[in-house]
Amino acid sequence: MPDIRAILSLQPIAAEWNGCRFQISRPTLADLVEAVDVNTKSPENARAWCLYRHCQDTDGKPLFADVADAMAAPAGFAAKVVPQIEALYNEGVD
């Protein structure tokens, strides 16, 4: 069961891919609104937007400069991380 304090304080989630550590930021209400907008206007960019918006290095700096940069991320990275990000949008609803 997720820690409700971590959810409400938007503490990032520690993550790792191919030995590289990074963080996944929890979504805010503004992120939810923007995610709906992105999915409505350009669904082909939705996965890249998720990576761009939520992936950060261990110092909290974005891993990707923009959505176009995130679109160039390795497919294996996106396949692992995007479902983790999507799950955060439903975190705590139970």
Provide a role label for each language-model segment.
Residues 8-10, 17-94:
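Short, surface-exposed, charged amphipathic helix/loop patches that serve as local interaction elements
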Residues 1-11:
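Extended acidic low-complexity intrinsically disordered regions
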